A protein has these predicted regions:
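Beta-propeller blade termini
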Residues: 59-70, 112-120, 125
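Beta-propeller fold detector
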Residues: 102-106, 151-159
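Positively charged n-region of N-terminal signal peptides that target proteins for export
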Residues: 1-4
């Protein structure tokens, strides 16, 4: 009888410990997603920004599109990865005085593309990190809007994954 009680007490302690661990891990995951450690969510074709992009670039095939306020003017901007014959490209549609302009294309990964909006330099605007791969070669680049152009701040292996 004593052994049964001891086993029951141990089982209760283990269950309480597992429940506590689950709660701690859940909070940690929520903190990570709140701290910018997650990739941006892709927009669908029905999104108004995607439709506006397509109206100005009807010959482009969007692979993925993402939105955030890149230039810190209070209006959402669009980052689109578009399919190219030889190479994919990233084109930004940036808001300016209630209108939008399109940046020149920059190379983009061929497969498994992801975008993260981050504020590396702690100024008002956001930098855009693009990652992806081609045939198992992983690469990434960090871009910043400067004077109406997407400036490549830093990257690694983008030539191998584009």
């Amino acid at each position: 009888m004593k052994k049964i009680i001891i086993y029951l007490v141990i089982a209760v302690i283990v269950l309480v410990g597992l429940a506590g661990l689950r709660e701690i891990l859940g909070r940690k995951a929520a903190e990570q997603s709140d701290s910018g450690n997650t990739y941006a969510t892709a927009l669908g074709e029905e999104d108004p920004l995607v439709q506006r992009f397509m109206a100005g670039n009807s010959d482009e095939e969007i692979i993925l599109a993402f939105s955030d306020d890149v230039n810190a003017d209070g209006t959402p901007d669009l980052i689109a990865i578009v399919r190219g014959d030889e190479m994919n490209h990233t084109i930004a549609m940036i808001s300016e005085n209630r209108d939008y302009f399109f940046t020149e294309p920059v190379p983009a990964p061929r497969e498994n593309q992801k975008v993260k909006f981050i504020n590396i330099d702690k100024d008002d605007d956001l930098e855009v990190m693009i990652t992806g791969e081609k045939n198992g070669q992983v690469g990434y680049a960090v871009f910043k809007m400067m004077k109406g152009r997407f400036k490549d701040l830093y990257g690694e292996n983008m030539k191998d994954c584009c």
